[in-house]
Amino acid sequence: MNDLGIMHKRILVDRSPVLYEGLITPERFKKDWEVRNAEWTCKDGALIGRNPQPGAGVVMSKRGFPGNVLMDFYGQTILPSTHDIDVMWNLSWNEKDNLRGQAYVVGVQGWWDGKVGIEKSPEYKLAALAPCPWFKPGQEYHVQAGSIDGHCFVFVDGVLRIELTDPNPIDSALHNRVGFEAYQCMIKVSRLIVRHIVWEKHTQTYAPEF
């Protein structure tokens, strides 16, 4: 059983339909992905990102994935880079200003002080962050991140690291691309699976203690 538990919800991973998966070949990369403000390539079925600038250098899907989405992948920094494994969903791009528009952004070893967290673009007024002293540069991590009607979460190696409820969820009918960000770093993303989340209510209560 690969269920993921967040507050009052159980995500049924194995029952969540797969929307996108498989090795990223040069043909699939050209067909399925777009690049902005960075160098993104594919190698041995993985996405490779390189961006020396302090900004959002992204690779994003050409197609949209409306609804509640789970981003499931393995990510690592490429040494000597030491920070920022970043993933996005409910994403749109502001072509006029060449900037990220609406999106939920999850980072592992980000925010300058080594944190794992979630933030909402483009205002960045909604965020939840926590230290991740367990992170080791160059080590591969299994990241599972997504949202259910604005209830955002990120698991790393099967452990819930942080969750956040957005009182004004992004409209996934309008903003529904997915992608990855290299922020002044080099990263590798492999074994990507995009799923439509199937979940069930999981009422939680305390057992009496006295």
Each language-model region and where it sits:
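Short, exposed beta-strand/loop patches in secreted or surface proteins that constitute
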Residues: 37-43, 62, 109, 145, ...
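Short carbohydrate-recognition loop motifs
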Residues: 38-57
